[in-house]
Amino acid sequence: MAKYLGPKLKLSRREGTDLFLKSGVRAIESKCKIDHLPGQHGSRRSRLSDYGIQLREKQKLRRMYVILERQFKKYYKKAVRMKGNTGENLLILLESRLDNVVYRMGFGSTRLESRQLISHKSIIINKKVINIPSYQIKPNDCIEVKEIAKKQSRIKAAIEISEQREKQSWIDVDRVKMQGIFKKFPDRSDLSSEINEHLIIELYSK
C-alpha cells in the first residue's frame, strides 16, 4: 500500500495543527512555525471557501490517523451504515483501530511506530498475535506486547514518552506489564475538540 514518505512536520504545518506524527518529546511549536504553510517562502493562510474548509478538515483527520483516502472513505461508508451519529461513528471507527489503540496505550511513540510493531508481530490481542494495523478493537479486548518484544528499547522509550500525554478514560494500561484493556468505545466528549467531523460528513454527502 502506498504511503507518505516525506517530512512529517510538513503535514502538520499544512493542516495548521499538531497531527501527532512525531514522538512528542518536544512541542511542535518549537520545531516549526505551525501557522505558516510549508516551503521556503511559506506564507500565512489565505481565506478558504466552504469546500476548502471541509477538505482541510478531512485531510487533517485522515493524516492524524495516517490513513490513505481510499481507506478513509471506506470508514465513512461504514459509519453511514451504523446506527447513531455518522460523524461520531467515524471517529469511533478510527479510534478503535489497533494501531491507534497501541499508540494510545503508549507502546508506540506515534501511530506509525505502533503500526510497525503490529506488522512485526509484536502485539497480542486476547492471547493471539494480530499483525493487521486496521484490526478493529472491541470493548474488553486485552492488548499486550509480546514477551520477546518487551525488551525493545523503542517500546520502553515510547512508554516513557507516553507519560507526558493525557490519559484516556476508555482504556486501562499497566505499563510495567506492557498490557492494557480497551474498556469501551470513547464518547465524543472524550475525543479532540479540534476535529469538526460535521464538516467531513458534509463534504462526503455532496
Curated annotation (Swiss-Prot):
Please name the source species.
Wigglesworthia glossinidia brevipalpis
Q: Which GO terms describe its molecular function?
A: rRNA binding; structural constituent of ribosome
Keywords noted in UniProt: Ribonucleoprotein, Ribosomal protein, RNA-binding, rRNA-binding
User: Which HAMAP family does its entry note?
Assistant: Ribosomal_uS4_B
Q: Which CDD domains match?
A: S4
Record protein name field: Small ribosomal subunit protein uS4
Q: Which domain of life is it from?
A: Bacteria
Entry-linked NCBIfam families:
PRK05327.1 (NF003717), rpsD_bact (TIGR01017)
Family note? Belongs to the universal ribosomal protein uS4 family.
Instruction: Name the job this protein performs.
Output: One of the primary rRNA binding proteins, it binds directly to 16S rRNA where it nucleates assembly of the body of the 30S subunit. With S5 and S12 plays an important role in translational accuracy.
The UniProt entry's GO CC annotations, sorted and at most eight, read:
small ribosomal subunit
GO annotation, biological process: ribosomal small subunit biogenesis; translation
Describe the subunit structure.
Part of the 30S ribosomal subunit. Contacts protein S5. The interaction surface between S4 and S5 is involved in control of translational fidelity.
InterPro entries this protein is in? Ribosomal_uS4 (IPR022801), Ribosomal_uS4_bac-type (IPR005709), Ribosomal_uS4_CS (IPR018079), Ribosomal_uS4_N (IPR001912), S4_RNA-bd (IPR002942), S4_RNA-bd_sf (IPR036986)
Listed PANTHER family: 30S 40S RIBOSOMAL PROTEIN (PTHR11831), SMALL RIBOSOMAL SUBUNIT PROTEIN US4M (PTHR11831:SF4)
Give residue ranges for domain S4 RNA-binding: 96-158
Entries under SMART domains matching the protein: Ribosomal_S4 (SM01390), S4 (SM00363)
